[in-house]
Every structure is written in structure tokens, then in C-alpha cells.
A protein has these predicted regions:
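Glycine-centered small-residue motifs that form tight turns
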Residues: 280-285, 309-317, 323, 339-348, ...
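Extracellular beta-strand-rich solenoid/capping regions of secreted or surface-exposed proteins
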Residues: 165-180, 189-211, 215-220, 227-245, ...
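Glycine-rich repeat segments that build the extracellular carbohydrate-interaction surface of secreted
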Residues: 132-134, 148-166, 178-184
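Right-handed parallel beta-helix
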Residues: 183-186, 205-227, 246-247, 263-272, ...
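Polar/charged low-complexity regions in secreted precursors and cytosolic/nuclear IDRs
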Residues: 69-70, 114, 290, 297-298, ...
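Low-complexity, acidic Ser/Thr/Pro-rich repeat tracts that form intrinsically disordered stalk/linker regions
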Residues: 1-13, 36-146
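Short, T/G/N/S-enriched strand-turn elements that build extracellular solenoid repeat scaffolds
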Residues: 140-151, 166-174, 181, 293, ...
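Gram-positive cell-envelope targeting signals
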Residues: 1-53, 160, 374, 404, ...
Length: 606
């Protein structure tokens, strides 16, 4: 055993690579409201429904092309690339491509690590326990790659014993590689700017946790602005993040509406993996060819820059080719990308995307032109818990999906919070664009933007307190000529979101996407307290549905039951707005639950 170990160390040292309401332009639109929901008297029963509450718990890019880099990971075999393959389109329509619309949470708490992994526990391999404690970058690479330190199933658990620096790429490969790394309150500072810290491939699994992580605190707080509150980082003298502040707009059902309250959470960052290099191509944790990354606790983040120009990465976590990211706890925060998906990015290679399973944890304070928190292309996002909060697009670049942006991907939200994300680009505030037509609606998606094929399903959870300087404060469903294959809303809450200069405070449905709101018996769906502040002749405080143009059919919406109330438009259509020259059919079969909405230009309730 010792000879094998010595040979391994010599070989490893020699190679040194360490592979380790109703209005707008021209359209044909059909709104079918056939609410299976009982009359309003029964909607009042919603008050008795128990609704989960939160536990204590900005550039050189263009929206005309969202291709990202083709990065070879140095000495590895990895050919992964965010660049789309032949026949795939990762582009989105710009304002010049669209007609103007007036022309022809879940559990936000972080559990304290109890050193128990349940069925997924990976015990320390037999041998000297000191071999599993890591105090240097060299030890990190040699020990994680040493098969003699693993059990017969390829499993081993390691624990940091000090803050360390590492400038190498560690390649974990093969299904017989199952590594658990306990940060133990310490930090790994990755000093390389051109290669990942971890590459995970060929069925290998890396699990990261932090046994020293503590739960976030909730200090006294009385801020009244309920939306668009970006997360923030505090740093030590070396600009390494040591504190995170993020916000959750908590929503509770009450009678025939909801009540929102803004909560502030502060996190002491203990154990962390930190990208310290400044390179727009850097993928800190890189998965390809069926790698798996589990984040149970601890923090994945980026060294900040004290100047105006922020350090950048491609993404903190990148996955493709059948790889899986499971996030049940911890934090992915504080990254800036000039591409997209600063926090987590899911890409494709060889026609194979990746999957994000979000069951817990927090993705916060990440910035990119597209998909500040999470970006997906040809992939899947399953959100059944956790929090995506306070992520942003840039102020000086048009963008989509501050929280989540998904193209040709399947997104399902069943629980958790997408909250206080901010799509910041504002045409009106850009130099030389002062006369730009307000409300063009060609960019947006404060919480979620999904388009260019794929599906968006909301059957639970909370889309709350998100802000878009343009359209779709909560959800931007489809883009002009780039429809979703499916958009369904069957449960959950979309509340207190804002679209500032364009339509759709809660939801904007772009042509030619078809939306279906159908809530199963016994379930509840709320579109409440959303706002659009555009003063033009369209609005849609709760929902806006776009009309048709050249060679593009109108969007449409079918509502079978849902509650749309207490939404507001500074223009028209407090509850919903659509194009006025089309045909609108409203069927009042079981009682209509679109009421109590307001608009200013109409000077009446709607």
C-alpha cells in the first residue's frame, strides 16, 4: 500500500498538471376565462389554507448573441463549451426586431450543519485520519486524487484544517470517485484565472459542505420598498467575502388576497470556495460528461474588487453533457459575469444539457447580462425549495432574467422563493436614449425569463418582490417570435412584482406564446399586488398578453381558474391588459376571480 502511495505521489508530482384589463396594438387574442374556482365567497376560504412561510432563514456583451466561450480546461480532455452547437440558436430578439406594442420561498433558512448526511453519508476511508485533513493547496490536490485514501466504493471524506490557496485544476473522474469535502469553516482561495479548481466528469461526484456554517440572522428591519432589493457582500481586508445580506419578500394568503412583508437576512460566511482570479472564462466548479456536484452547505463565491471595475468569472458553477447540480443548502453568491449565468450556468454539448435540482440554499448577489443568478440553455431547472434572491442584470446593457433566464429549457417551480431580483437596464436613463419609446417591452424578466422553446411550469412557490426596469416584473414568458412550447400556471403566488417602463407587472406573455392558468381543485394560485408604472396606453398590472406582428401570431391566454386581484397599472388594465383590436371572449361559468384591481388612466377599478 505504501509503495503504491509513493508511486502515486511521484507520478503526481512529475506531471504537476493535477488532473484532478384590455388594450394595446393590433392583435387577434382570445382570453377564455372559465374559472373552475368557486365564486368569490368560496375564494374567501383561501384564508383557511395554510401557506408555507419563509423560515428564518453590472459588460461587454450583447443580447443579440448569447453565445459564450469555448474554454478548453488546459491539461484536461474536457471540450466543454457554452458555445452553442450547429443548429442551435442562443440569440434573442432585440427591440429593432420587434414591433412596438402600440403598432400595427419555501425555506430561506440555512440549516446548521449537523455532520449527518443521512443515506448519502460517505464515511472516512480506512487509514490514518490525519491523511484526510488538508492544510495546503498541495495536500488538496494530492489527497483528493489518491485512490489509496478511498474505500472500496471510491468514497472518501476530507476536511480542511486551515485556509489554503490552490492554483491547480483538480480533475475528479470516473463513477468510482465519490469525494466529500468539509470546508470546516475555512476557505479555499483559487488563484488561477484560466482553469477551474474542480473539474468533475465521467460519473464522478463531489459533495461540498461546511460543518461550521451557522444559520442566517434576521435583524430588526423596517424598509418599505418591497421589490428589487439587491443582495450585498461585505469583505475582509483581502476583498474575500465574509458577509452576505439578502432579502425575501414573504407572502402570506389572507382572505381573497395576499399580504407581503420584506425580510432581511444576514449571513456570516465561514467555509468557502473563492475564485480569486479575474478571467471572464473561468468556471470555478466545472462539470461535463455526467459529473455530479452536491452543495449541502458552505459558500461558493468570488473575490470582490474595491474599485469600480468588478472581477469577473464565466460562472461559479458550470455544468453540461448530462451533468447534475444538486443544491440543498449553502450559498452561491457575489459573482459577476460578462457572459451569462454568473452564479450557476447550465449549457449544452453534444446535444446534451444539464440539470439543476434546487431543494435548498440561497443563490444571491450575482450579476450578468443574462441570467444573473441562474442561466440555462437546453437544460432543466427543478426548484422545489431554496431561495434565488437579489441577483441582477447590468444597468448599462439590455438583459433578461435577473433571477433565472432559460432558453430552450424546461423550468419547473414547485416551492421556494424567487424574490427581489432586479432586471436593471432602463432605456430612459441611458445617454442618447432619452427619447426612446417607453414600454417597448423587448427586455425584462425580473424574476424569471424563459423563451426560445422549452417549458415554464409554476405549480407552487413564490415569485415575489422582483423588479424589471422594462417588462415582466415577475415573469417574462416568451420573447418576440421565440415562444415557449408550454407555459402553465397551476399554483403558487406571484405577488408584489413591478414592471417600471413597460407592461406586465406580474407576468408578460410575449407573442406567440400560449399561456394556460389552470388550478387543480384544492390548490390555490394568486396573482396579487403587482404593478406596472408605464403611463402609455397599455399596462397589465397583473398580466399582459402581447399582440401579433409581421409573421408572428398573437400571444394568447386561457384562464380556467386563478385569483387576480389588487394589482395596479398607471396606464390601463390593472388586472390584465391585452390588445384592443382583437377578439376577447370571457365566459363567466363558475364565477370570476378577477376583481379589485386598479388603473390610473381608466380612472376606475378593473
Amino acid at each position: 500500500m505504501k509503495a503504491n502511495s509513493d508511486k502515486f505521489k511521484q507520478s503526481n508530482k512529475a506531471t504537476r498538471r493535477v488532473l484532478a384589463g384590455v388594450l394595446c396594438g393590433a392583435s387577434v387574442l382570445s382570453l377564455v376565462l372559465s374559472l373552475v374556482m368557486p365564486p368569490i365567497s368560496q375564494a374567501i376560504a383561501n384564508d383557511a389554507q395554510t401557506v408555507p412561510t419563509v423560515k428564518t432563514v453590472a459588460e461587454d456583451s450583447s443580447t443579440e448573441s448569447t453565445d459564450v466561450d469555448n474554454t478548453n480546461n488546459g491539461v484536461t480532455e474536457n471540450q466543454n463549451s457554452d458555445e452553442t452547437e450547429s443548429g442551435e440558436s442562443n440569440t434573442i430578439a432585440t427591440e429593432a426586431d420587434q414591433p412596438s406594442d402600440d403598432a400595427g420561498v419555501g425555506d430561506a433558512a440555512q440549516p446548521v450543519e449537523d455532520d449527518t448526511n443521512g443515506e448519502n453519508a460517505i464515511a472516512l476511508a480506512a487509514g490514518n485520519e490525519s491523511d484526510h485533513k488538508i492544510s495546503s493547496g498541495e495536500e488538496l490536490s494530492t489527497r483528493l486524487l489518491n485512490p489509496d485514501l478511498r474505500d472500496n466504493n471510491g468514497a472518501a471524506t476530507f476536511e480542511l484544517a486551515a485556509d489554503i490557496e490552490c492554483d491547480e485544476e483538480i480533475l475528479l473522474e470516473g463513477a468510482n470517485t465519490k469525494i466529500t469535502l468539509d470546508l470546516n469553516g475555512f476557505k479555499i482561495k483559487h488563484e488561477s484565472s484560466n482553469q477551474p479548481l474542480f473539474s468533475i466528469t465521467g460519473g464522478a461526484t463531489l459533495t461540498v459542505k461546511d460543518g461550521a456554517q451557522t444559520a442566517p440572522t434576521e435583524p430588526p428591519f423596517n424598509q418599505k420598498i418591497m421589490n428589487g432589493n439587491l443582495a450585498s457582500m461585505e469583505c475582509d481586508d483581502s476583498n474575500i467575502p465574509n458577509k452576505l445580506t439578502y432579502y425575501v419578500t414573504e407572502s402570506v394568503a389572507k382572505g381573497t388576497g395576499t399580504t407581503e412583508t420584506l425580510k432581511e437576512y444576514k449571513v456570516d460566511i465561514k467555509g468557502a470556495i473563492v475564485a480569486c482570479g479575474d478571467n471572464a472564462d473561468l468556471k470555478l466548479v466545472n462539470l461535463y460528461k455526467t459529473g455530479t456536484f452536491n452543495l449541502e452547505s458552505g459558500t461558493i463565491t468570488q473575490q470582490q474588487n474595491s474599485g469600480d471595475q468588478k472581477n469577473s468569472v464565466n460562472s461559479l458553477v458550470y455544468a453540461e453533457e448530462g451533468s447534475i447540480v444538486n443544491m440543498s443548502g449553502g450559498y452561491v453568491c457575489g459573482a459577476t459575469s460578462m457572459n451569462h449565468g454568473a452564479g450557476i450556468e447550465l449549457g449544452t454539448m453534444n446535444n446534451s444539457g444539464a440539470t439543476l435540482n434546487l431543494t435548498g440554499g440561497v443563490i444571491a448577489g450575482n450579476y450578468a447580462p443574462i441570467g444573473g443568478g441562474v442561466n440555462a440553455y437546453g437544460s432543466k431547472i427543478n426548484m422545489t425549495g431554496g431561495t434565488i434572491s437579489g441577483n441582477g442584470t447590468f444597468k448599462d446593457l439590455p438583459g433578461y432574467g435577473a433571477g433565472i433566464c432559460a432558453q430552450n429549457s424546461d423550468v419547473t417551480v414547485s416551492d421556494g422563493y424567487v424574490t427581489n431580483n432586479n432586471c436593471q437596464f432602463d432605456y430612459i436613463k441611458q445617454q442618447g436614449m432619452e427619447d426612446k419609446h417607453k414600454g417597448n417591452g423587448c427586455h425584462g424578466g425580473g424574476g424569471i425569463a424563459a423563451f426560445n422553446g422549452g417549458s415554464l411550469t409554476i405549480n407552487g412557490g413564490y415569485i415575489t418582490g422582483n423588479y424589471s426596469a422594462e417588462a415582466g416584473g415577475g415573469i417574462y414568458a416568451g420573447a418576440w417570435g421565440q415562444a415557449l412550447s408550454s407555459f402553465k400556471f397551476s399554483g403558487g403566488t406571484i405577488a408584489s412584482n413591478v414592471a417600471q417602463n413597460s407592461e406586465g407587472g406580474g407576468i408578460r406573455i410575449a407573442a406567440p406564446t400560449v399561456g394556460v392558468f389552470e388550478v387543480p381543485k384544492g390548490s390555490h394560485a394568486y396573482i396579487t399586488n403587482n404593478t406596472t408604472n408605464t403611463t402609455n396606453d397599455w399596462g397589465g398590472g397583473g398580466v399582459f398578453v402581447q399582440g401579433y406582428g409581421d409573421n408572428v401570431q398573437a400571444a394568447s391566454l386561457k384562464i380556467y381558474n386563478a385569483l387576480i386581484t389588487k394589482n395596479d397599472a398607471q396606464g390601463f388594465g390593472g388586472g390584465f391588459a391585452a390588445c384592443p383590436t382583437g377578439e376577447t371572449a370571457i365566459t363567466n361559468t363558475y364565477g370570476i376571480a378577477i376583481f379589485g384591481n386598479t388603473d390610473k388612466n381608466g380612472e376606475h377599478r378593473s
